[in-house]
């Protein structure tokens, strides 16, 4: 199969490109950032010319659904395959989602159930995976062991810089701010079920919108006010608060490395290591950590984030917050360890630091499960099978 891969510097693009080659695809790449994902005329022109110059192309592919790519594919009546790796993904609110040329694959089942009604024949559920063959090829040197060996590591943002709520909380009336903070605190006590959008009323969401500096969506978008408030304001605030509290609690009892570019001034006990390149540093960090921590972003309501597959695919022992879909693919306690509160997490960290044999066996089981069922190669073959059998 010949396809055009529209790359825009998503962290998982290289792994997907590697998998396309391994399964025998002929890939033509359009590799540049998109200034306006909805209407950039230069990008539209460049992609249309690339489609015209490659008459044997069967489809166009991108990470995340991008409306300007959908527009080009509609012009040529060529299938546009997209695989969304983010929640929320605002572009799914675009009216271009309804194009019959789209084949949209979503990794979070609740996200899939929310958006599927807008194009029932063209939106599918597909979990994420990892570039296991590349992770396998990475050997950790003695020098890298000295640099990266640690008891516990977390790689990722604290979400302080991404949390819109922080920039608007002082614009809210006291009663609204109190209600929002109460929702966040209540959500933080519930693992495995995100109820924020369910409990917010339409009236409260509209009032919230009126009080803050709202970032309006493009004209041809559906404006889901409740969804945006729940995910990008309250959901991100939950993520930020949970990560800071969890890392603080861990670092008060254990030796922990944190790889992040976020502000860490509120985390005095953690070993702040700076940023970590996803392809050239993260695999070594995973392989050198006794415990790899996953804390899922709250707007990912049921699905498995990309990070879980990367951690397990690199052979890491993983402790993760509970997500509803995890038991569908991995056996808790055999392939991965799950926690349902900070005290539970601290107890499991202590246990598995003291029980190396169990820790190593669980990491091996998780790796084998990813190798057998959850590689990018297998996921892309599933994707092609779906569109071929339509």
Predicted regions and their residues:
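N-terminal pre-catalytic "stem/leader" segment of glycosyltransferase-like enzymes
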Residues: 1-77, 228-232, 255-256, 376, ...
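Nucleotide-sugar donor-binding catalytic core of glycosyltransferases
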Residues: 4-12, 121-300, 323-326
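Catalytic binding pocket for nucleotide-activated donors in carbohydrate/polymer assembly enzymes
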Residues: 4-7, 11-14, 18-23, 28-37, ...
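Short acidic active-site motifs
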Residues: 46, 69, 92, 280-281, ...
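Structural motif
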Residues: 58-59, 79, 291, 317
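Short, conserved loop/helix-junction motifs that constitute active-site signature segments
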Residues: 73-75, 96-99, 145-147, 251
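Active-site proximal beta-strand in glycosyltransferases
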Residues: 73-88, 103-106, 128, 153
């Amino acid at each position: 199969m010949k396809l055009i891969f529209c790359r825009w510097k998503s962290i998982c693009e290289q792994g997907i490109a590697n998998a396309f080659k391994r399964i025998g695809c002929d890939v033509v790449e359009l590799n540049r950032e998109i200034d306006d994902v909805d209407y950039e005329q230069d990008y539209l022109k460049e992609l249309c010319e690339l489609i015209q110059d490659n008459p044997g192309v069967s489809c166009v592919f991108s990470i995340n659904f991008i409306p300007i790519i959908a527009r080009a594919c509609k012009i040529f009546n060529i299938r546009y395959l997209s695989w969304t790796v983010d929640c929320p993904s605002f572009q799914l609110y675009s009216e271009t989602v309804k194009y019959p040329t789209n084949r949209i694959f979503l990794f979070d089942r609740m996200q899939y159930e929310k958006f599927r009604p807008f194009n029932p024949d063209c939106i599918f559920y597909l979990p994420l995976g990892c570039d296991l063959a590349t992770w396998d090829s990475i050997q950790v040197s003695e020098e890298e062991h000295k640099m990266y060996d640690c008891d516990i590591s977390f790689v990722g943002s604290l979400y302080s810089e991404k949390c819109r709520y922080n920039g608007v909380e002082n614009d809210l009336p006291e009663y609204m701010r109190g209600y929002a903070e109460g929702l966040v605190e209540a959500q933080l006590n519930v693992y495995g079920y995100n109820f924020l959008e369910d409990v917010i009323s339409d009236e409260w969401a509209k009032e919230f919108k009126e009080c803050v500096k709202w970032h309006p969506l493009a004209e041809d978008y559906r404006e889901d006010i409740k969804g945006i408030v729940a995910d990008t304001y309250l959901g991100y605030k939950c993520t930020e608060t949970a990560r800071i509290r969890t890392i603080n609690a861990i670092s008060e009892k254990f030796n922990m490395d944190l790889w992040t570019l976020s502000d860490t001034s509120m985390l005095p006990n953690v070993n702040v290591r700076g940023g970590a390149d996803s392809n050239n540093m993260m695999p070594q960090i995973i392989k050198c950590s006794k415990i790899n921590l996953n804390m899922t972003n709250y707007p990912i309501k049921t699905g498995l984030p990309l990070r879980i597959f990367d951690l397990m695919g690199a052979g890491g022992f993983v402790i993760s917050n509970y997500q509803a879909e995890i038991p569908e693919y991995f056996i808790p306690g055999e392939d991965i360890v799950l926690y349902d509160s900070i005290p539970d997490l601290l107890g499991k960290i202590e246990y598995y630091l003291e029980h190396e044999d169990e820790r190593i066996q669980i990491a091996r089981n998780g790796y084998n499960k990813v190798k057998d069922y959850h590689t990018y190669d297998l996921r892309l073959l599933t994707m092609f099978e779906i569109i071929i059998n339509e």
